[in-house]
């Protein structure tokens, strides 16, 4: 009986020690907050224009976009790939005396060269849908200048948006 108790005590202390002897956890990922203005155009299919008209929003097929993007970059080491989390708030149609709100939450990746891709939900008065975006961010010193294209296919039709703006790296 004494040997059994000794063996159980040895096993109880050996397991936690073994678990602590494994490889070290990677260092915490560095994050960078980037936010800045966005400006661009959205091209609406006939079905989207009709859907907006049903909700008393009368616009042409091309509307202006003005807004703000909140971005958080997550990266580690110099691997070149950066994970992104973005919230994009836009007001469309200001050129036509209407304000159509839009909110997108995008999750994606950016390469060291600035090419980027993201996907996420988009909410507007025309409905809720999945947005697909791609683009490139050009850097000039501390200034980042993105050029992005997004496609939002819906039951009513398709929205295609082109946005640019800037952020400052701090």
Spans of features found by a protein language model:
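Cleavable N-terminal export/targeting peptides
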Residues: 1-29
């Amino acid at each position: 009986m004494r040997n059994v108790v000794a063996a159980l005590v040895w096993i109880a202390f050996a397991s936690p020690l073994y678990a602590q002897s494994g490889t070290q956890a990677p260092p915490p990922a560095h994050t960078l907050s980037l936010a800045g203005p966005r400006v661009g155009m959205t091209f609406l299919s006939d079905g989207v224009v009709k859907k907006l008209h049903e909700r008393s929003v009368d616009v042409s097929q091309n509307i202006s976009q003005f807004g703000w993007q909140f971005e958080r970059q997550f990266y580690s080491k110099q691997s070149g790939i950066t994970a992104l989390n973005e919230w994009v708030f836009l007001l469309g149609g200001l050129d036509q005396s209407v304000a159509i709100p839009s909110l997108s939450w995008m999750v994606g990746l950016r390469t060291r060269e600035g090419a980027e891709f993201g996907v996420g939900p988009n909410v507007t008065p025309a409905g809720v849908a999945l947005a697909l975006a791609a683009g490139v961010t050009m850097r000039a010193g501390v200034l980042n200048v993105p050029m992005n294209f997004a496609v939002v296919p819906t039951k009513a039709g398709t929205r295609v948006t082109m946005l640019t703006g800037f952020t400052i790296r701090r």
